[in-house]
Amino acid sequence: MNVPFRVGQGYDVHALVAGRPLIIGGVTIPHTHGLQGHSDADVLLHAVTDALLGAAGLGDIGRHFPDTDPAYRGADSRVLLRDAVAKVRAAGWAPVNIDATVHAQAPKIGPHAGAMVANIAADAGIDSASVNIKAKTNEGLGYLGRKEGIAATVVALLARAS
């Protein structure tokens, strides 16, 4: 079937640990803890990357940028996102819009959302009006509510490239 649109969803979660910078959506946020991971552990950009790759039928971030590969140690997730977008476009698809939710008890995401939107739009090659970021707490429940980690969920729409 030759469908004109595809939808992908992405999810990622990382533990908060001392001694690392907190980078979300390509923005360094002042905080006492950062996210643990092989790369820069940008939970939002990892979920965006998964959503785009999934919508294009190209698997997930782990297939393209495995955490077992030393080449990706400390990698900038914006570089990974741009590479994933190039793969999506090479497969004949173009990003249309991205809707994301960052799940974090702390820090507050809202003051940084505009910069995150600008980064994601630039890296995906779409207008910033086509990127939306929401922030939610976990109301003190579970590991997110206990400030042990931060998660992100993303939905992305692709259109067949002309």
Swiss-Prot record:
It comes from the Bacteria. GO terms for biological process: isopentenyl diphosphate biosynthetic process, methylerythritol 4-phosphate pathway; terpenoid biosynthetic process. It is an enzyme of class 4 (lyase). The keyword Metal-binding applies. A divalent metal cation binds at D12, H14, H46. Pathway: Isoprenoid biosynthesis; isopentenyl diphosphate biosynthesis via DXP pathway; isopentenyl diphosphate from 1-deoxy-D-xylulose 5-phosphate: step 4/6. Keywords: Isoprene biosynthesis, Lyase, Metal-binding. The record marks H38, T137 as: Transition state stabilizer. Its EC number is 4.6.1.12. It catalyses: 4-CDP-2-C-methyl-D-erythritol 2-phosphate = 2-C-methyl-D-erythritol 2,4-cyclic diphosphate + CMP. Binds 1 divalent metal cation per subunit. Belongs to the IspF family. Homotrimer. This is 2-C-methyl-D-erythritol 2,4-cyclodiphosphate synthase.
